[in-house]
Amino acid sequence: METERVKIRQLQVNEQNPRTCTDKRFEKRVSSVITFPKMLEVRQIVVGEGGVALGGNMRLRALQAIATMTDDEIMRHIEQSAKYKDRPECEREALLRYWQKWKHDPMVSVVRTDNMTEDERREFIIKDNVGFGAWDWDMLANDWDTDE
């Protein structure tokens, strides 16, 4: 599978994603993405037909939120992070400049699942574990077989 860069507006959060995320955990995810953007190159968003995210839904949501943030909001995330709290101002400003540039043309690396069957896509969604989310047990019980 090859990666490609696409505009985030071409991607959709998967409404059938059986994971949930509290506001507090989502803010942590946003901060995590802001302070470690290189992770987006290593952990691409996995997309199916129509640009629907099968893996990386919370990262996609975080990027969608970052795309609408002011510089002050982004800097607040940077300054409050343990990683950047004691770093020189020039490093914090460099990270802010990265996001300012990114916001002019918000893109992300994706992997497409065109060569997966529907069953393989469903299996992938279940097995792709993201630590900031929590399971939506009702959705799992209603929409997913326990053997999956």
Spans of model-derived segments:
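Short, charged/polar connector segments at secondary-structure boundaries
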Residues: M1-T113, E120-E148
